[in-house]
Amino acid sequence: MLELFRNWVNHPKEGRGRKNLEQTDDYWKKVIQDIRSWENSEDESLSESAKYILYTGKIRRVHLDLDEVNYNNHYVSWTSAEKLEDLYWFDPSSAHTILTAEATIENPGISVKGFIEAVKKFEDKNFELNSPAIRKEQEVIFPLQEKSIISIEKIKSEIRI
């Protein structure tokens, strides 16, 4: 599982995106299955780790210069950060689209921050997976699916003089 998180966090952000999306989706679905089995485990470290890693609540995804949302149901990066400015690459003055979705108990997200916290608590208190700048993003891994979208907000670029 650690290698999957490492590969996910360290993929390039620019370009055409991730490869092998179906395979990656299968991995994340398996991770959710495994973590759900931990929820009722008598092993306290497993049951508590599940609480850290499975994410429910509002999440947002920012697309730059997006005309239309492609609901492809693939797992992608979302954020639980309150301030979008915490996304190191985000420029609020450029044109962008903000998708807001709801991760639920039936359809949870996977919290990268929660994974890091669980590893720190139960395995290695010095564990790091990403840089402080990326850590502020509070990444949640969640599928891009129309049924989970609460709102779509399109922002035009600000004209600078």
Where are these regions (language model features)?
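Conserved NAD+-utilizing ADP-ribose enzyme module
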Residues: M1-G57, L66-I161
